[in-house]
Amino acid sequence: LPLVADIAAAGHQIALHSATHQYSKIYASTDAFWQDIRTLRQALEPYVDVAAIDWLRFPGGSTNTVSHRYGGNGIMKTLKAQAEDKGYHWIDWNVCAEDATASHPDAAQILRNIRRDADGQDTCVVLLHDTKATGQTVKALPDMIAYFREQGYNFCTVAQMDALQCETK
């Protein structure tokens, strides 16, 4: 986690996701979800100003259906409303690298997936993963960045994009 301080100092935005990423636990109830977020905030507290973190991404996305198995059909709708009530903004992706799938794609396939999903999009929010099992993502990253620049995209934080401070393609 100390790396998070360096990431924030470099101007990157820190957002909340999950302390455990265990759907069966975090989506068992809304209380379980928010406890997981509190645990994450406590872990980050020594490294960044957690009071300034007001963005999150729901594991599986805000429209995931796997959560229904654990917390019922309405849990995501309730969590989204609660997030807004708590002062959080939440974001989903529209471009998926598919880098965390069981097939473990190589860097070339990750880039093909991104190009496929980005085609026709004015604004792209790309889902990438940084686990040990997804080492190919790091290898694909320079080519991803080059691709988006060649296509005329600009890079910005989610907060900048939300505030329309970052021009779309």
Regions found by a protein language model. Give the residues of each.
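Short, well-structured secondary-structure segments
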Residues: D6-A8, Q13-H17, I91
